[in-house]
Amino acid sequence: MASEKQKQHAQPGKEHVMESSPQFSSSDYQPSNKLRGKVALITGGDSGIGRAVGYCFASEGATVAFTYVKGQEEKDAQETLQMLKEVKTSDSKEPIAIPTDLGFDENCKRVVDEVVNAFGRIDVLINNAAEQYESSTIEEIDEPRLERVFRTNIFSYFFLTRHALKHMKEGSSIINTTSVNAYKGNASLLDYTATKGAIVAFTRGLALQLAEKGIRVNGVAPGPIWTPLIPASFNEEKIKNFGSEVPMKRAGQPIEVAPSYVFLACNHCSSYFTGQVLHPNGGAVVNA
């Protein structure tokens, strides 16, 4: 599936330069207005899983706003924005793309304010942005890197959720992207895996807090999914063999994960789901 030419040398990775492009859409996906009239904010929505979620949400009638890394993902963001405009339904509003660094509270507040100024509210919040760096020992993880990973991967979830909740009503949904690594561990992604475990706990605790308000909180824990984060994180050998260790013997595609988010965002489909995590992971068995 991948070759040595795939290797990228900077986070968070760029989709438009990938030799084997991730699949964010499919002719087999048949929308049915599951999210008609909803306003969705997707972090890290310019590529990978976030782009596929945006595609499905827009196809299902949602108005979509997404964030991307300021100054690093402009081309991916513009391609995603154009795609969303093409697949959106006639009764949804024009999508918007917001460049930012989500690791800081003031930036997260600005993102929420921009979405609310444009669309009046937030019905679905997708906390999805992440970064990861490979290391062989804990000694390699210095304080600046540890803080950077935690700021992006879990601090931003707290920041965005806190600000977004002011504009979310009963029936709204929060969906957090965790990882199969939160359940099985990963020796070479120690700091990343720790944040993903924190996201599971955050999801379950927040679900308990918000149940009385009628706001559901769930998560998705993808397995090995082919996104720009992979060639930006691993060495050539791991890129080449990525996904081969799961029972299905291949990496998943973003479009194979995105319907899980549609399911959790749709009240008709998942009104009795909160505090739960879905596991699209190619057959890896985890203790949920």
Swiss-Prot record:
Residues 1-32 are annotated as: Disordered. NADP(+) binds at residues 47-71. PROSITE patterns: ADH_SHORT (PS00061). It is found in: Plastid, Chloroplast. Its EC number is 1.1.1.-. Substrate binds at residue 179. Residues 20-32 have a biased composition (Polar residues). The active site is at residue 192. Residues 1-18 have a biased composition (Basic and acidic residues). GO terms for molecular function: alcohol dehydrogenase (NADP+) activity. InterPro entries: NAD(P)-bd_dom_sf, Sc_DH/Rdtase_CS, SDR_fam. Its main location: plastid. Keywords: Chloroplast, NADP, Oxidoreductase, Plastid, Transit peptide. PANTHER family: NADPH-DEPENDENT ALDEHYDE REDUCTASE 1, CHLOROPLASTIC, NADPH-DEPENDENT ALDEHYDE REDUCTASE-LIKE PROTEIN, CHLOROPLASTIC-RELATED. Aldehyde reductase that catalyzes the reduction of the aldehyde carbonyl groups on saturated and alpha,beta-unsaturated aldehydes with more than 5 carbons. No activity on alpha,beta-unsaturated ketones. Can use propionaldehyde, butyraldehyde, methylglyoxal, (e)-2-pentenal, (E)-2-hexenal, (Z)-3-hexenal and (E)-2-nonenal as substrates, but not propenal (acrolein), crotonaldehyde, 2-butanone, 3-buten-2-one or 1-penten-3-one. May act as a short alcohol-polyol-sugar dehydrogenase possibly related to carbohydrate metabolism and the acquisition of desiccation tolerance. Belongs to the short-chain dehydrogenases/reductases (SDR) family. This is NADPH-dependent aldehyde reductase 1, chloroplastic.
